[in-house]
From Swiss-Prot:
Enzyme Commission number(s) from the entry: 3.6.-.-
Reported function: Exhibits a very high intrinsic GTPase hydrolysis rate. Involved in the addition of a carboxymethylaminomethyl (cmnm) group at the wobble position (U34) of certain tRNAs, forming tRNA-cmnm(5)s(2)U34.
Organism: Wolbachia pipientis wMel
CDD domains with a match to the protein in the record: trmE, TrmE_N
Cofactor binding remark: Binds 1 potassium ion per subunit.
Top-level class of the enzyme under EC nomenclature: hydrolase
PANTHER family hit by this protein: TRNA MODIFICATION GTPASE GTPBP3 (PTHR42714), TRNA MODIFICATION GTPASE GTPBP3, MITOCHONDRIAL (PTHR42714:SF2)
Residues that hold (6S)-5-formyl-5,6,7,8-tetrahydrofolate according to the record: R24, E82, K120, K508
Gene for this chain: mnmE
Record's subcellular location: Cytoplasm
Name of the protein described by the UniProt record: tRNA modification GTPase MnmE
Annotated ranges, domain TrmE-type G: 217-433
PROSITE patterns tied to this protein: G_TRME (PS51709)
Amino acid sequence: MTNTNETIFALSTVFGKSGVAVIRISGNYALKALNHFHIKKEIKPRFATLVDLYDDSSQLIDNGIIIYFPAPNSFTGEDVIELQVHGSKAVIKIILEELSKVFVMAKPGEFSLRAFLNGKFDLTQIEGIADLIDAETKMQAKQAIKQISGELERLYSNWRQRLITIQSKIEAYIDFPEDIWAEKSELEKINNEVQSLVQLIQEHLNDNRRGERLREGLHIVITGEPNVGKSTLFNFLAKRDIAIVSEYAGTTRDILEAHIDIGGYPIILSDTAGIRESSDPIELEGISRAKKRSFEADLRIELFPFEQRHDVNYQATGNIPSVVDTQLCKYCNQQTVSSQCLTLGSRYKNTCKLCNRQWILETCAENNVHSWIPVSATCMTSDQNDTIYVLSKADDVINNHNIKINGIDLLPISILKEIGTNKLISLIKEKAEEKFGHDRDTPVITRQRHRNHMKKALEHLQRFNIDNPIELISEDLRLAAFELGAVIGIIDVEEILSSVFSNFCVGK
């Protein structure tokens, strides 16, 4: 994969105008850079030294800081030179050209690969470094730092060592069966230890993908009928004008995305086409995409128009205005759902089953009225924690207290008058904390690669049966330990290493 005998170099900072640019050199001959740039000063290890850098013709290139990290006490475990020069494109280009005369340009992730090969980090720590570089929010950085500190490595190494200990006992029986395997108590201890590991790995896998979600971002979709304020809310949360806002219904056809930070959590916010009946094939495609994205989302913000109708009963009791009754109920056409639902003023008492999505889906399917199913029903989830219900355009609302229907909270908001917006943001943060597992100290799986190996390890352990032939027992334990070792990189599998390090930038 790489020739570690070569001395490599690369720009470690972004190429462009900046105050400082850092160029890293690593390898057995890194100190040759001193002679190449005609540096005469004594360079003390781990001290910053101001030097002048000259080219082959003794022309001054720049002055900057040089730091020497002798092996093995460096990032890569090799001799490392770091040059800190002015962040000028011209200076950077000249220095890189000079270095290419004596060294080899590093491949993406090659510095980190050498650090791994020299035992400075395990694979999960290396991946943590990549995640920290990519982190855009506080919580992403916090998770990456935990991984760099060796949190996952310690957990998986402990499990792997326990398996190796069990396997050593079984291997001993193969050589000396009369000494060990005859004791029933020893059999029970081994079986209990394996079952304990099975339970621990199962619990580790049943984490609702918290770590992966935090790395990738929580997918939130804004849904609702046309012209209910979806794009206005989208632009407000994104803090910039991305979607076109118009009084004409159906402006948004395709899905728009924005990456935002709410309370330190990464959010991928999507604005979608309004859900309605249409004969326009382009709009229908947009509606289809909206429903699909809503189904796949981690969280939905579902909008209904408030449209104040001077409902005295609402002002007095907090009940929802009749117009919203109509808005919500019209999906249940021609008494296919519940006659009580269609009665204006019913206020969705216990007879109303609108908020039971699975019930709506089944009932509408029985009566062949799929076109009337709202997007909330098409999501096919009965977990109301996955949806935030919002009454939009509530410009005339007296207060921003939640309105309850059948125990479901609907939040009135007005972007124009900034009513309920802070409450909505707080609610999104609360939902994100629930999804990500706020402030949990338990190590979490952060990549699909980890999850795949853990699943395979679990499969081998679940096949463990103390009554099986001893050779099969030993093989299952060996394979389970192999999968755990693959996560942290104890085994030498080039496909795994290529997959991990190919995603790094050059210079890291």
